[in-house]
Amino acid sequence: MGNLNFVLSPLDQFEVRDLLSINANLLGNFHLSLTNIGLYLTIGIFLILTYSLLATNNNKIIPNNWSISQESIYATVH
């Protein structure tokens, strides 16, 4: 078992870290990076768009379960 003598600050969870970075010196010192926050936002947008596509009712009169759940979430938040 390892020796755990160090104490982590609670603020360490909010640190922005580079996960993937590209340095292009040919384009005038161009730096492009994907951070942990960018990854979380990308995953969140993907999940929301997938849920919205599943809840699309295709102009039917009677809503399906996905559509009802989406309307319930909208009514709760709005």
From Swiss-Prot:
Record has Membrane as a keyword: yes
Transmembrane segments: 34-54
One GO CC term on file: proton-transporting ATP synthase complex
Subcellular location: Mitochondrion inner membrane
Organism: Aspergillus amstelodami
One MF term in the entry's GO annotations: proton-transporting ATP synthase activity, rotational mechanism
Role description: Mitochondrial membrane ATP synthase (F(1)F(0) ATP synthase or Complex V) produces ATP from ADP in the presence of a proton gradient across the membrane which is generated by electron transport complexes of the respiratory chain. F-type ATPases consist of two structural domains, F(1) - containing the extramembraneous catalytic core and F(0) - containing the membrane proton channel, linked together by a central stalk and a peripheral stalk. During catalysis, ATP synthesis in the catalytic domain of F(1) is coupled via a rotary mechanism of the central stalk subunits to proton translocation.
UniProt membrane topology term: Multi-pass membrane protein
Complexes and interactors: F-type ATPases have 2 components, CF(1) - the catalytic core - and CF(0) - the membrane proton channel. CF(1) has five subunits: alpha(3), beta(3), gamma(1), delta(1), epsilon(1). CF(0) has three main subunits: a, b and c.
Protein name from the UniProt record: ATP synthase subunit a
Cited InterPro entries: ATP_synth_F0_asu_bact/mt
Swiss-Prot/TrEMBL keywords: ATP synthesis, CF(0), Hydrogen ion transport, Ion transport, Membrane, Mitochondrion, Mitochondrion inner membrane, Transmembrane, Transmembrane helix, Transport
Family to which this protein belongs: Belongs to the ATPase A chain family.
